[in-house]
Amino acid sequence: MIRTLRSLLALALVALSVSTAAGADKIRVVTTIPDLKALTEEVGGKLVDVDALARGTQNAHELEIRPSLMLKLRRADILIENGLDLDAWADVAVQGANNPNIVRGAPGRIDVSRGVQVLEVPSTRVDRSMGDVHPLGNPHYSLDPGMAPIVTQNIVDALARVAPDRRAELERNRQSFLSRLDEAMTRWTRAMEPLKGAKVVVYHPQWIYLLTRFGLVQAATLEDRPGIPASPAHLSRVIRQMRDEQIKVLIVEPWNDLKLANRVAQEAGAKAVVLAPLVGGVKGADTYIGAIDHNVNALVTAMK
């Protein structure tokens, strides 16, 4: 498979047009998910040219490796990954790209989860019978805007290794973004304050960082086990719990079964709410702050 993908990659490289002089001066960055693309563009500004391998509407756990993705990696100076096994598929893509700058352990391979306070780290041995449980903990930390200062500092450090003379500019960009994020955080915290302690049901357990940040409680999951479709008996239990505890919101991702989520919510007297798991996951969530804006506004509206 890798040999075939490399052959397709070679053809793509032949067809690739020559980069412009302006583009050649930029640091070529590839990120695994669009949240990291958005944050890298905030920090890097005009110094970077950034591509993301996954789209916001895709389940980042299950990305299909294609020659177009390997082409992006083949030309990258830096690969920025989420880590915590969310983007473990990146190793396969890097192998096909044949770029020594971004192999695991190389200076151009950056895991920005370093320093993040990881939630839901399993306390027992994990096996496949438990579903898609992450042995290193829940990897969806970018849903908590409070993690952005750590992640953006890791990005600054990564870019400064390639362009050490531009560190001061990178730091200024970061501080400018964090100032805007602080203003937004004040707005989000004020809007979510009346909802503290409210219970929600989630389709898939990837929202714990967002819920914890704003004081909401994850009462149940629509999946029986992570990544495994629920049985009718499990769905009945969830509906009964939602009725008994007067839970009004069921959070669902764009790629999951909205028809099922709507049916469960309707039977429970609740609402199914589509949030943005990633930047670009829903219409209007095209920036990092914009994605959190959407999620906060959708929750506040649904819980009125």
Provide a role label for each language-model segment:
Residues L11-A22:
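Hydrophobic h-region of N-terminal signal peptides that target proteins for export
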Residues M1-L9:
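Bacterial N-terminal signal peptides that target proteins for export
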Residues G23-K304:
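Extracytoplasmic metal-acquisition and chelation regions
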Residues R3, S19, V30-T31:
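Intrinsically disordered/low-complexity terminal segments and short unstructured peptides
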